[in-house]
Amino acid sequence: MSYRRKSWLEKLADKKCLPKTLRLEKGFPCYNAVHKMGAEVGDKVVLVNPSEVVEVMKMVPEGRLITIVEICRKIARKHRVKACCTLTTGIFIMVAANAAEEASKQGGNLNIPYWRTLKAGGFLNEKYPGGVGSHKKLLEKEGFKIIRKGGKLAVSDYEKYLVHV
């Protein structure tokens, strides 16, 4: 029996096991990131479905930005927990971006302005379709200035453009 790789659109489908709330442990892969956001061992952390992440991504209008940190904070508030797993959220952001491009190539439109979603610190996402080069072009098309921070690309003064969701 041969294996067929799932499409990005298939990967974007909600999972039956999510959302799920867990108590934060030091061994969690997202521990360091959620700890930086204020969560402590024993605090409740939510893992959500891709649709919840996409819902927040779609709220960002042209000329505005959001980072994974703001997305996680909004989702955590919605679920009345201390934090949202940044690892699964980051994966779903990347899946949403690739699914949007896949749909576009098939003549569809998911209306996900994924390029307005940045990594923490305003950095561009190398896992978006076309890598940071394409991400940079899409952001510059909307008037954002891209700078080099260390060895990575970021939006200059990204904090000024953050949408409050």
Name these PLM-found stretches.
Residues S2-V165:
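Nucleic acid-binding interface residues in structured DNA/RNA-binding domains
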